[in-house]
Curated annotation (Swiss-Prot):
Gene: mptN
Record GO terms (molecular function): ATP binding; GTP binding; ligase activity, forming carbon-nitrogen bonds; metal ion binding
Sorted UniProt keywords: ATP-binding, GTP-binding, Ligase, Magnesium, Manganese, Metal-binding, Nucleotide-binding
Entry GO terms, CC: cytoplasm
Function of the protein: Catalyzes the ATP or GTP-dependent addition of one L-glutamate molecule to tetrahydromethanopterin, producing tetrahydrosarcinapterin.
PANTHER family on file: BETA-CITRYLGLUTAMATE SYNTHASE B-RELATED (PTHR21621:SF0), RIBOSOMAL PROTEIN S6 MODIFICATION PROTEIN (PTHR21621)
Positions that bind Mg(2+) 1: 247, 259
The protein's name: Tetrahydromethanopterin:alpha-L-glutamate ligase
Superkingdom: Archaea
Length: 292
């Protein structure tokens, strides 16, 4: 049996999946999207290194790269999905990768999330920012806590400058109300859900308001409560994923979803959790392929 790992670059996650596949007597196939050639003729073919990839049992998507090429690669994988089960589904990856879509889906499905305003007009954004005592600007597309800007207690002139700078870099201004932790600490929760079960969770704490592990956040064990499990499963299903890393904030009125990650790493979780996440993913992938 051959199982794919689609990633433009090798990283800790691809190596973990590859190793776990080998331990399950599965032949891992590392697929670089840039190396796939598609034949669109009477017989549709997708090949890498002159070998078809249509015989894969299923394939994990890890990283399809950046730039203009990314749009082609996304479309290519979406069509490959007609022949090979792709995990996560490409529609779900698209929903999770766009913060506007994620926020919209949280609201449609009545899942608690911070108040959010999205605008392209800087002056309108400035008026909207005044609705919040404290606000965070986030790139629509991005991860690992990169590109975040917190606007708190600034003068109107300083806010306008921050918004103009953000707009010139990112094009669209996505603003989210800053949620204070009731315990007066900088921390959030990353919960890892596979199928219909939240299998692991951690607090990410920091002396800075950006708590991502890639921004020096420190992982600590987090109990999987009924409240946490319920909101994480709802977020995963709303976005349309098989598995996910869901980021949660604690607030004075309960938990709130801030992000749903469709291609999450569990390197940080592996430091504090005894759960074999890679094995859980392989098992779920085989079940998904069986029902595909």
């Amino acid at each position: 049996m051959r199982m794919g790992i689609i990633s433009e670059e090798r990283d800790w996650v691809t190596d973990e999946l590859k190793s776990k596949m080998e331990k399950n007597d599965i032949d891992p196939v590392i697929i670089q999207p840039s190396k796939i050639i598609s034949y669109i003729e009477s017989e549709v073919k997708f090949e890498q290194n002159n070998r078809s990839i249509l015989d894969l049992k299923c394939a994990f998507v890890r990283n399809i790269g950046e730039g203009v090429e990314m749009f082609h690669r996304f479309d290519m994988l979406k069509y490959l999905e007609n022949y090979v089960p792709i995990i996560n589904p490409m529609d779900g990856i698209e929903n999770a990768g766009n913060k506007f879509r994620t926020s919209f889906l949280m609201e449609v499905h009545k899942i608690p999330h911070p108040k959010t305003i999205v605008a392209e007009d800087v002056n309108k954004a400035l008026i909207a920012a005044d609705k919040f005592e404290d606000v965070v600007l986030k790139p629509l597309f991005g991860n690992q806590g990169k590109g975040l800007v917190r606007v708190k207690g600034r003068s109107t002139v300083a806010k306008l400058k921050a918004l103009n700078t953000f707009k010139s870099t990112h094009g669209v201004i996505y603003m989210q109300e800053f949620v204070n932790n009731p315990n007066n600490v900088y921390r959030d929760i990353r919960a890892f859900v596979v199928g219909d079960k939240v299998i692991s969770a951690m607090y990410r704490t920091s002396d800075n308001w950006i708590t991502n592990i890639h921004q020096n956040g420190v992982p600590e064990k987090c109990e999987i409560t009924e409240e946490l499990s319920k909101i994480v499963l709802a977020a995963k299903d709303a976005v349309g994923l098989v598995y996910a890393g869901v980021d949660i904030l604690e607030s004075s009125d309960g938990l709130k979803v801030i992000e749903v990650n469709a291609c999450p790493s569990w390197e940080g979780l592996s430091r504090i959790s005894e759960v074999d996440i890679a094995q859980n993913l392989i098992d779920e992938a085989l079940n998904y392929a069986k029902e595909y």
